[in-house]
């Protein structure tokens, strides 16, 4: 009888990527099939996030539910991974002794051995070490699920913003070798992927080793990925303003595959608060990046992250954030009230903004950005938009749905052969959460750029050096 795996994932896109790799890995090593029902599972994995408030309590609340399942099935294997596991591994073991496996973001590739250890009789396994980039060398080949895919290109962060736990939970910045990244993307392109989203906690800090001993910059990587035939839409998440160099802006000038939509976190509009956060840039420097981007891509839309109610933030400083929002004209945001993260420098600062004031500021900020987003959507009425078709519409299975470059959902009447391809749509209706339109052009009428076939990348000879690290030769 086939054994089942249930994974519950919280947090960022990197966690979503990690969870998909766990599923692929355990399917290849143990034949575990994914199930949406925890009650059916033989292995339960919780992939955690420590960014949000009360992250630890949320974990223990979920584990309490799974404890009841373990009482009914003593052979059930329970594992906790992700950033809370990395930060609170020993505490989880003490407070939830029924948890079998505790692993960090950098040790998920060791899950097969950990499960084997538990099934061989070991009481518990804890591995929250930071073996750099080893996990990518131990994961199975990627499997495409639809026309879009995430590809992790680097891990960790060296910036140590005062409010953030990422450097402590995912370690310092480590970039994947260039050829490993290109090989994975070429494999996905061979399977029909058309849009790739490059992932990293500080993605534009990518400095990937090349097979000849050199270093590939993030800007160079963007051009190389965009040149792979079939990859006709390219995104990246999450970037840092202090790493947003002019060579990246130049890619926006001459690389049509790179979308006219950018997520660039700023967190606040007050220079004093930015200094307290140790962000490493001013509001003017942030606006300078946006100005340069719009000089080469006038239609680019920007989303961002904001923290309101940071320790010591005054009403005047919050207004500076609101002024920045208006000046940049953000299309979207991930915005949150400040809450202290244990072990971070900001946790030692007086949290002197009341919860009521934080919530009020958050409401004001989100209303402003929602209004700006609605204006962007209304401006799309009557325009032609290139849409990547994802499948049948959730609203009407007789119609199709897809996304624009700026992440708007578009529903339209189409044919099944359009799924997984691009179509140009004239927008006829604008709704709160979606758009509607008519097909004006199919992919075979677009003349998309053709540079290098995925097979040409895959066919490069993969070799290993004396340390067993894979590389590509000529």
UniProtKB/Swiss-Prot annotation:
Binds 2 [4Fe-4S] clusters. One cluster is coordinated with 3 cysteines and an exchangeable S-adenosyl-L-methionine. Pfam families: Radical_SAM, TRAM, UPF0004. The keyword Cell wall biogenesis/degradation does not apply. Residues 378-441 form the TRAM domain. Gene3D superfamilies: Methylthiotransferase, N-terminal domain, tm_1862 like domain. It comes from Mannheimia succiniciproducens (strain KCTC 0769BP / MBEL55E). GO terms for cellular component: cytosol. [4Fe-4S] cluster 1 binds at residues 12, 49, 83. One of its GO terms (molecular function) is metal ion binding. Its cofactor is [4Fe-4S] cluster. Signal peptide: none annotated. Its EC number is 2.8.4.3. It is an enzyme of class 2 (transferase). NCBIfam families: miaB-methiolase, MiaB/RimO family radical SAM methylthiotransferase. SUPFAM superfamilies: Radical SAM enzymes (SSF102114). [4Fe-4S] cluster 2 binds at residues 157, 161, 164. It comes from the Bacteria. Belongs to the methylthiotransferase family. MiaB subfamily. This is tRNA-2-methylthio-N(6)-dimethylallyladenosine synthase. Catalyzes the methylthiolation of N6-(dimethylallyl)adenosine (i(6)A), leading to the formation of 2-methylthio-N6-(dimethylallyl)adenosine (ms(2)i(6)A) at position 37 in tRNAs that read codons beginning with uridine. Residues 3-120 form the MTTase N-terminal domain. Monomer. It catalyses: N(6)-dimethylallyladenosine(37) in tRNA + (sulfur carrier)-SH + AH2 + 2 S-adenosyl-L-methionine = 2-methylsulfanyl-N(6)-dimethylallyladenosine(37) in tRNA + (sulfur carrier)-H + 5'-deoxyadenosine + L-methionine + A + S-adenosyl-L-homocysteine + 2 H(+).
């Amino acid at each position: 009888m086939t054994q089942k795996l249930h994974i519950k994932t919280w947090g960022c896109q990197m966690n979503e990527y990690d969870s998909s790799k766990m599923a692929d890995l355990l399917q290849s090593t143990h034949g575990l099939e994914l199930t949406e029902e925890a009650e059916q599972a033989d292995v339960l994995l919780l992939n955690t996030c420590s960014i949000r408030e009360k992250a630890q309590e949320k974990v223990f609340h979920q584990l309490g539910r799974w404890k009841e399942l373990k009482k009914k099935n003593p052979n059930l294997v329970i594992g906790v991974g992700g950033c809370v596991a990395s930060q609170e591994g020993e505490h989880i073991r003490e407070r939830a002794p029924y948890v079998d496996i505790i692993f960090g973001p950098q040790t998920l590739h060791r899950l097969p051995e950990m499960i084997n250890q538990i099934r061989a009789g070991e009481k518990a396994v804890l591995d929250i070490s930071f073996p750099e980039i080893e996990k990518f060398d131990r994961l199975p080949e990627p499997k495409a699920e639809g026309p879009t895919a995430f590809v992790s290109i680097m891990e960790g962060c060296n910036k140590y913003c005062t409010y953030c736990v990422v450097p402590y939970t995912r370690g310092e910045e480590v970039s994947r070798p260039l050829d490993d990244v290109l090989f994975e993307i070429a494999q996905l392109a061979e399977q029909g992927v058309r849009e790739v989203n490059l992932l990293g906690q500080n993605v534009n800090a990518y400095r990937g080793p090349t097979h000849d001993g050199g270093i590939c910059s993030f800007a160079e990587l963007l051009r190389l990925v965009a040149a792979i035939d079939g990859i006709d839409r390219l995104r990246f998440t999450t970037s840092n303003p202090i790493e947003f160099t002019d060579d990246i802006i130049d890619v926006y000038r001459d690389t049509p595959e790179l979308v006219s939509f950018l997520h660039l976190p700023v967190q606040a509009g007050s220079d004093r608060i930015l200094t307290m956060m140790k962000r490493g840039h001013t509001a003017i420097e942030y606006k300078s990046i946006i100005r340069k981007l719009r000089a080469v891509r006038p239609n680019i839309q920007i989303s961002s992250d904001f923290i309101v109610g940071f320790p010591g933030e005054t009403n005047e400083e919050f207004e500076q954030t609101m002024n920045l929002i208006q000046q940049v004209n953000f299309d979207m945001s991930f915005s949150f009230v400040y809450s202290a993260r244990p072990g971070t420098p900001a946790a030692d600062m007086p949290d002197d903004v009341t919860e009521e004031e934080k919530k009020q500021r958050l409401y004001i900020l989100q209303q402003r950005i929602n209004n700006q987003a609605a204006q962007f959507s209304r401006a799309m009425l009557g325009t032609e938009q290139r849409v990547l078709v994802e499948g049948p519409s959730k609203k009407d299975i007789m119609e199709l749905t897809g996304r624009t470059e700026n992440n708007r959902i578009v529903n339209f009447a189409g044919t099944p052969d359009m799924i997984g391809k691009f179509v140009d749509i004239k927008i006829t209706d604008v709704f709160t959460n979606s758009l509607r339109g008519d097909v004006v052009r199919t992919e075979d009428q677009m003349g998309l750029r053709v540079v290098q076939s995925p097979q040409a990348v895959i066919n490069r000879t993969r070799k290993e050096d004396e340390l067993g690290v894979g590389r590509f030769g000529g």
